[in-house]
């Protein structure tokens, strides 16, 4: 599968939460047509990252990780680095950053999209 095909499919079925997400989706669609290397972080104009919101089994707690570089708490995430399956990217980042081994995605598409 074309590495950007899944992202294009997500964008076509994604329902924006608000006007800003709608505008961001339009910009991302445009960039997908114009930029060949959106999966690589060396694209300084724009590139894809993926993150995950990790819940406990009862869904009443969320995992936050302390980011030493930025000196702040955040959810897990990272750069696509050439990988077009952003769910896989998000899952890989959670495992690397948290040490969790067993993960079960609740959704197979994005919760939010932003630039």
Task: For every predicted segment, state its role.
Residues 13-51:
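Acidic, metal-coordinating catalytic segment for phosphate/diphosphate chemistry
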Residues 29, 50, 74-75, 112:
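Charge-rich, low-complexity amphipathic helices
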Residues 7, 31-32, 38, 73, ...:
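Generic signal for short, ordered secondary-structure residues
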Residues 58-103, 107-111:
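Conserved Nudix-box catalytic region and its N-terminal flanking loop in Nudix hydrolases
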Residues 2-6:
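Non-transmembrane, interaction-prone alpha-helical and coil segments associated with secretion
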Residues 42, 111-115:
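Acidic pyrophosphate-coordinating catalytic loop
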């Amino acid at each position: 599968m074309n590495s950007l095909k899944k992202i294009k499919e997500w964008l076509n079925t994604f329902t924006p939460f608000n006007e800003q997400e709608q505008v961001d989706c339009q910009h991302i669609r445009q960039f997908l047509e114009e930029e060949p290397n959106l999966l690589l972080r060396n694209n300084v104009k724009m590139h894809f990252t993926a993150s995950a919101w990790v819940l406990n089994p009862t869904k009443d707690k969320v995992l936050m990780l302390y980011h030493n570089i930025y000196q702040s708490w955040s959810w897990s995430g990272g750069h696509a680095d050439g990988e077009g399956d952003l769910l896989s990217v998000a899952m890989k980042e959670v495992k690397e950053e948290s040490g969790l081994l067993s993960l079960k995605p609740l959704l197979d598409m994005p919760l939010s999209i932003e630039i």
